[in-house]
Amino acid sequence: MAEKLPPEVQAQLAKFQQLKDQLDRLLLEKSTIENELREINKVLEELSVLNADATIYKIVGNLLVKSDKTSVEKELNDRKELLELRSRTYQKQESILRKQLEDLQAKINEMLSKYYPQGGQTGIKA
């Protein structure tokens, strides 16, 4: 029969799982932002080779709307700036979460070593 983990360890493991889930969600959002940034950069690159008076269409909902190059570039650059700010914010949050996870993992390992000083004989792996 497997030994039950002490409540303190269980609480720390639950906190660890919450932080891990939070990091996973953050990484997914960050990936989405990075993909959108790549797409915006590609579009801006394509726009740069067009004449200023070129006919441009953009998607608005379910419609294609005629627009001018300057306003589309401004819109894309504004969106790019916002996404870059979000990306930097997510990068900082990711660093903080990774540090918290690392610290919590060390704390859990320390707690486990106090409860199970023989190590591998209990069947618990950190």
From Swiss-Prot:
Family per record: Belongs to the prefoldin subunit beta family.
One CC-aspect GO term: prefoldin complex
Record's subunit section: Heterohexamer of two alpha and four beta subunits.
Superkingdom: Archaea
Keywords for this protein: Chaperone, Cytoplasm
Name of the protein in question: Prefoldin subunit beta
GO biological process terms, semicolon-separated: chaperone-mediated protein complex assembly; protein folding
Function per UniProt: Molecular chaperone capable of stabilizing a range of proteins. Seems to fulfill an ATP-independent, HSP70-like function in archaeal de novo protein folding.
Matches recorded under InterPro entries: PFD_beta-like (IPR002777), PfdB (IPR012713), Prefoldin (IPR009053)
Stored Pfam families: Prefoldin_2
Chief localisation class: cytoplasm
Organism of this sequence: Saccharolobus islandicus (strain L.S.2.15 / Lassen #1)
PANTHER family assigned to the protein according to its UniProt record, in alphabetical order: PREFOLDIN SUBUNIT 6 (PTHR21431:SF0)
GO molecular function: protein-folding chaperone binding; unfolded protein binding
Locations listed in the record: Cytoplasm
